[in-house]
């Protein structure tokens, strides 16, 4: 009964919200769980780990197209001592498979995120509306509104930079936000040097990330697959090529701000960007003149 109560408590929050809210920071209560059966559900994992302590958040990563488990996830315990209890047990078996729990290590050298990418933004949303919505989370340092060079109209995304990281944590507690007339997705803008580091770490995997389903110029849904072409301040892998994030390199290096170089679970890559966008892809236009040279330093998760 106690385990079920603990599970019901975490249902009050969006799955993974507490884990994602501090993804780039060390938290002694967080664990990475690899080697999961594709049949293992969030409930199964939570109930199993609850015997070691109260679980306050749990998420299993899935392929955005098929919905199939990628074979790994993250869990957050209320008490860091629970992590030690898990690690004291040398062997863990769930749904007929040996699973691989490890401490979640924040990537070294990463600054707390202060900049977010907002995807799915209606070009009709005024700058004042954007300021009003995002300003409610904290003090804004800068807003970047990229333009389409051909139409001279706003593109369907923007970047928000805050003066500190706390507003970003609050924003990430919910993946989707209703802004103006559209439902938008929020992602952290990742420094380019960290992205490069992750790519170097992943070279030993089963092919490059762009060699996934369809590759960088592979199967797309309309123009959405290439909406970053010409927006050269950002990596194509993160914005334009939704299919490039599937398959290919299976290392866990850098997933969600954690370093798991060399762990090759599952048959799906976890991607570098917006692999999970669907119907809104064609909204984002074609080319852009960007929004300032400081954009050169970022790449979203």
Curated annotation (Swiss-Prot):
Q: Mind listing the GO molecular function terms for this protein?
A: DNA binding; RNA binding
Q: Can you quote a single GO CC term?
A: nucleus
Instruction: Give the signal peptide range.
Output: none
Which InterPro entries did the record assign? Answer: hnRPDL_RRM1, Nucleotide-bd_a/b_plait_sf, RBD_domain_sf, RRM_dom
Major localization listed first in the record, in broad terms: nucleus
Question: N6-methyllysine occurs at which residues?
Answer: 42
Keyword Metal-binding listed: no
* UniProt PTM: Dimethylation of Arg-289 is probably of the asymmetric type.
Omega-N-methylarginine modification sites are: 289
Q: Which segments constitute the RRM domain?
A: 29-111, 114-193
Identify residues that carry Phosphoserine. Answer: 122
- In the record, Dimethylated arginine modifications are located at 289
Q: Which GO terms describe its biological process?
A: mRNA metabolic process
Location(s), subcellular: Nucleus; Cytoplasm
Q: Where is this cross-link: Glycyl lysine isopeptide (Lys-Gly) (interchain with G-Cter in SUMO2)?
A: 90
Tissues where the protein occurs: Expressed in skeletal muscle, myoblast, myotube, heart, brain, liver, kidney, heart, lung, stomach, small intestine, large intestine, spleen, and testis (at protein level). Expressed in brain, skeletal muscle, heart, lung, liver, stomach, small intestine, large intestine, kidney, spleen and testis.
State a single Pfam family of this protein. RRM_1
The source's superkingdom equals: Eukaryota
Q: Where is the composition biased (Gly residues)?
A: 204-223
Which keywords annotate this record?
Answer: Acetylation, Activator, Cytoplasm, DNA-binding, Isopeptide bond, Methylation, Nucleus, Phosphoprotein, Repeat, Repressor, RNA-binding, Transcription, Transcription regulation, Ubl conjugation
Where N6-acetyllysine occurs, the residues are 97
Query: Residue ranges of region Disordered?
Result: 194-229, 279-301
Biological role stated in the UniProt entry: Acts as a transcriptional regulator. Promotes transcription repression. Promotes transcription activation in differentiated myotubes. Binds to double- and single-stranded DNA sequences. Binds to the transcription suppressor CATR sequence of the COX5B promoter. Binds with high affinity to RNA molecules that contain AU-rich elements (AREs) found within the 3'-UTR of many proto-oncogenes and cytokine mRNAs. Binds both to nuclear and cytoplasmic poly(A) mRNAs. Binds to poly(G) and poly(A), but not to poly(U) or poly(C) RNA homopolymers. Binds to the 5'-ACUAGC-3' RNA consensus sequence.
Name of protein: Heterogeneous nuclear ribonucleoprotein D-like
